From Swiss-Prot:
This is Iron-sulfur cluster assembly protein CyaY. InterPro entries: CyaY (IPR047584), Frataxin/CyaY (IPR002908), Frataxin/CyaY_sf (IPR036524), Frataxin_CS (IPR020895). Involved in iron-sulfur (Fe-S) cluster assembly. May act as a regulator of Fe-S biogenesis. The gene is cyaY. The keyword Metal-binding applies.
Length: 114
């Protein structure tokens, strides 16, 4: 997939961060997990009862979404199929986020990408 222009990437990343925000809020409610979701610009912060956080933000120069969680730091790039995948493990973004959120909330949370 050829690189996007910066404005194309920013629009795509903005839409994806909004989508993640909505999906996390819905999944947390369904799982009865206490997760505070806050968005400031291109940074989405998930805060848990124990004070830990997951931070998701867009990195326009790299055309990636970066995730910082207790499990580590991860970079996700959009593939030809439109899915965001980890640049190292190739794990899909929503599968990975489900695991990170479940680990930090001590509640089984599954994010539905669709």
């Amino acid at each position: 997939m050829p690189p996007l222009s910066e404005s194309e990437f920013l629009a795509l990343a903005e839409a994806e961060l909004t989508r993640i925000e909505n999906i996390v809020e819905t999944a947390a409610d369904e799982a009865d997990a206490d997760i505070e979701v806050n968005r400031t610009g291109n940074v989405l912060t998930l805060e848990f009862d124990d004070g830990s956080k997951i931070i998701i933000n867009s990195q326009a120069p790299m055309q990636e979404l970066w995730v910082a969680a207790r499990a580590g730091g991860f970079h996700f790039r959009r593939g030809d199929d439109g899915r965001w995948v980890d640049t190292r493990s190739k794990e899909e973004l929503y599968v990975a986020l489900s695991r990170y959120i479940s680990q930090q909330s001590d509640v089984d949370v599954t994010l539905a990408a669709g």
